[in-house]
Amino acid sequence: EVVAALASEHHPWAKSTLEVLAKRSPLMLHVAFEQIRRARGMTLEDELRMERGLVRHCFHPHHLNRRAGQTETAEGIRALAVDKDHLPRWEPAALTAVTAEMVAPFFVSPWPSWAHPLREL
């Protein structure tokens, strides 16, 4: 819906924003959008706990049946800083291929509440 709204605009800002979004990981765009939606109703402390879990999942994607080197984060770093080809191979490659089932596990805390690193906020 965000992409469709931007595409319907004729303002240069909308066009440049679409160009930037087209270069980003479709999966992580969905995760970021879901994060914003969820954070609206959270306390700052709970939002920071959610954020910490997201960071963990970005580097340790066991919930996606991937190894640490197979993350969108690692792929973005590879394309930008290691190989410098600026051609990330996102998985999935299209926004329309991302499912709710791919996004939801990012929001399951890797820790029980009593063991969360930010439990005392």
Where are the regions that the model predicts?
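C-terminal alpha-helix plus adjacent terminal tail
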Residues: 1-121
